[in-house]
Every structure is written in C-alpha cells, then in structure tokens.
Amino acid sequence: MKLHELHDNPGANRKKKRVARGPGSGKGKTAGRGIKGQTSRSGVALNGYEGGQMPLYRRLPKRGFSKPNRLEFAVVNLGQLQAFVDAGKLDAKADVTEDALVAAGVIRRKLDGVRVLAKGEIKAALNLSVAGASKAAVEAIEKAGGKITVSRPAKEAAAAE
C-alpha cells in the first residue's frame, strides 16, 4: 500500500446539500423548511421551551448542592509511582514532594494537593510528602520500607485559621 493509493470508502464523504439556490436544486424556495410557521423562520425556539407548558426542568424537584469551597485533589496511584521510579523519572532516594511529582510528569498540576491511593504495587522505599493518602496506601508504602508524611492542604489549613 502506498500513500497515493489511500482513499475514503465509497459513501464515506457526502457533499453538503446547498439549499435555497433555485428550483433546479430540489431544495429551492423554502429550503426544506416547509411553509410558514416558527420553524420556517430564523431563530427557532430555544431548547427546553415547550410552548408554554411547564417545562420538564421546572417540573422536576431540585436536588443536592455543590459545595463552593470543595477541595479537589490530584490522584496518584502506587502503581504509577513505581512505574516512574522504574523509568528513572522519579528518584527513590530523594524526598518526593508534590512539586517533585509535577516536575517528573506524574501529574499535570497539584490542584489543592495530591492524594495517594493504593491501586497497584510499590516496591521502592519512597519518602513521600503529600496532602492526603488512603490507609491502604500508607500501609503499602511503610511495608515497602518507605515513609509518608500527610500534611493538610494549604487551602484547608488557611480556612482553619
């Protein structure tokens, strides 16, 4: 197979139908919109408008709420940490902080802090300093000979003061 032999399957690309371009096109005059009425005109009704009937989104009750100052954590699994140590992107001997995880590319940004979860296995003895960790993750890290320091997220600490 060569580059010049590549082409779409028959019928994969359809030409766009040009409307309102005379009677010969088959879609002239009313352009497939029918005659008169709201939908024949520009600016058709808004989605969710049911012609004056009480709309569905108002018939149903409100539920729940969004916590405005909710903390959002970047999640890191033990398997990810081990993979980055094996690849040489994370130094197991040095202290592993949230900033070090961002620099190594384990996470893109730390949000309100980093939370370590126990998915996967860890063999490296890491000295971690993060904002949160599950009990299983703490046990696994300590079992591997590492140490984990869980500090409160900066946002939470500021709110407590």
Curated annotation (Swiss-Prot):
- One Pfam match, given by its short name, reads Ribosomal_L27A
SUPFAM superfamilies in the record: Ribosomal proteins L15p and L18e (SSF52080)
Could you give one GO CC term from the UniProt record?
Answer: large ribosomal subunit
The alphabetized UniProt keywords are: Ribonucleoprotein, Ribosomal protein, RNA-binding, rRNA-binding
Disordered as annotated region, ranges: 1-47
Q: From the Swiss-Prot or TrEMBL record, what is one GO molecular function term?
A: structural constituent of ribosome
Biological process per Gene Ontology, one example term: translation
This protein's record includes keyword Ribosomal protein: yes
Compositional bias (Gly residues) at which positions?
Answer: 23-35
Function, as annotated, reads:
Binds to the 23S rRNA.
The text of the family note is: Belongs to the universal ribosomal protein uL15 family.
Q: How does it assemble?
A: Part of the 50S ribosomal subunit.
Q: What is the protein's given name?
A: Large ribosomal subunit protein uL15
